[in-house]
Amino acid sequence: YGLYLIFNECIKHDDFVKIINSSSYTAHITGADGTKRDVKWEPTNYYAKGEATPPDNVTIIGGKTGTTKGAGNCLILLTKDSSGNPYISIIMGAGSKPLLYQDMTSMLSKI
């Protein structure tokens, strides 16, 4: 429930939604010592990478992946149905990446 609460607050900010819906994002960072550098992030979720296909009636906006030994493979997504209604979907503890996306696609097909 905690992940849902955090993600639900994040998606209230247009900049956050824009970033998670991007093919990549580059941040311009200035360190405490004044040095500047650019850091580029690219999505790791299989839907964004074209390695998994969502159901036809669902549009993936973006989300966050995470994997640890203790938590397993996890994914939280913002999606919209064909009428534009938003949904937050979470899968936690999947034993593998393929199973994670199989479970998420199955859940999204219920929308």
Language-model region placement:
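Penicillin-recognizing serine hydrolase domain
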Residues: 1-111
